[in-house]
């Protein structure tokens, strides 16, 4: 069988996977990460309330992860990914209206469903097929490294949009002016998510029939039970959870820059976006090396570094 890496148009497919893989999280995660002080101010939130929103998101996402994998076994990834992007973008329209805290909790629960249930399993499966049997490390390196580049680029672009629509200097701009400028950032982000969904739906290649077969849903549920009995699966879970705990710590960099270093909102947003540029560089370099050596070694080094 011909390796999917070598098939015509595979570069377009991985590019769309990279775009969708990061833009799907742009509204619920990247904007609060890059614009943390601004996000708290314009939505009149404190850190506990924002953390509660993420908890609502995480709870819904956890349930979606469990059942979403079954859905990805039965439908073409491109359709699942596109639908997820469309519904996620609609949530951005609600966010741009500056809803109440109660509505924000509903919105984050909604995003926990739209960004994971139909999306995550489909993206992982499509990436695995793209990489073939001998290039899994490269495939996921390009995916995660590319996602990091997209996040950094969108963060920087968001900062430019925010500063461009401020009618006064950031220090003299009042809350209403900041909210209006940030609204454009939200709407632009929503448009980019929707546009990516359109591109995925019409331009991403279909997976080969013999590589992605539709499976009976009952068999899929049975497979979940079987997989959970494998010890290495639980070790992988621990690795992923621990890695994300370390990753989430970096979310407060922009808030630290604002409250401790006394940077203004534009400068703190720049701090939040600039840190994202390290992600693509490290991901690609490590994964290219990991394909030729033991990946366990790099996991150990990573945790020691953190």
Q: Where do the model's predicted regions map?
A:
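Cytoplasmic membrane-interface "Motif A"-like loop-to-helix N-cap segments
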Residues: 74-85, 291-303
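Helix-to-loop junctions at the C-terminal end of transmembrane segments
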Residues: 64-76, 281-295
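Flexible cytoplasmic inter-helical loops of multi-pass small-molecule transporters
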Residues: 201-222
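Cytoplasmic helix-loop-helix junction between adjacent transmembrane helices
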Residues: 108-146
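Extracytoplasmic gate region of multi-pass secondary transporters
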Residues: 32-36, 147, 151-159, 231-273
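C-terminal ends and interior cores of transmembrane alpha-helices
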Residues: 86-100, 304-306
């Amino acid at each position: 069988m011909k390796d999917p890496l070598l098939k015509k148009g595979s570069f377009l497919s991985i590019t769309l996977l990279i775009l969708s893989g990061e833009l799907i999280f742009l509204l619920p995660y990247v904007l609060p990460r890059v614009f943390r002080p601004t996000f708290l101010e314009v939505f009149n939130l404190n850190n506990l309330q924002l953390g509660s929103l993420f908890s609502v998101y995480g709870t819904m996402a956890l349930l979606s992860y469990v059942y979403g994998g079954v859905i990805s076994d039965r439908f073409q990834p491109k359709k699942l990914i596109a639908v997820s992007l469309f519904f996620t973008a609609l949530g951005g329209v609600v966010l741009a209206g500056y809803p109440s805290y109660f509505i924000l909790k509903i919105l984050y629960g909604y995003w926990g469903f739209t960004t994971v249930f139909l999306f995550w399993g489909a993206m992982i499966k499509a990436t695995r097929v793209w990489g073939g049997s001998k290039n899994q490390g490269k495939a996921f390196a390009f995916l995660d490294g590319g996602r990091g580049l997209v996040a950094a680029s969108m963060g920087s672009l968001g900062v430019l949009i925010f500063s461009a629509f401020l009618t006064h200097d950031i220090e003299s701009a009042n809350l209403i002016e900041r909210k209006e400028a940030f609204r454009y950032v939200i709407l632009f982000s929503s448009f980019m998510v929707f546009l990516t969904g359109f591109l995925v739906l019409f331009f991403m290649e279909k997976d080969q029939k013999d590589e992605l077969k539709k499976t009976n849903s009952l068999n899929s549920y049975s497979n979940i039970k079987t997989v959970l009995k494998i010890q290495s699966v639980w070790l992988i879970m621990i690795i992923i959870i621990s890695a994300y705990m370390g990753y989430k710590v970096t979310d407060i960099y922009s808030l630290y820059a604002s409250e401790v270093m006394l940077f203004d909102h534009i400068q703190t947003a720049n701090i939040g976006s600039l840190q994202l540029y390290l992600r693509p560089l490290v991901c690609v370099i490590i994964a290219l090396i990991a394909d030729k050596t033991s990946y366990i070694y790099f996991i150990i080094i990573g945790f020691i570094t953190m």
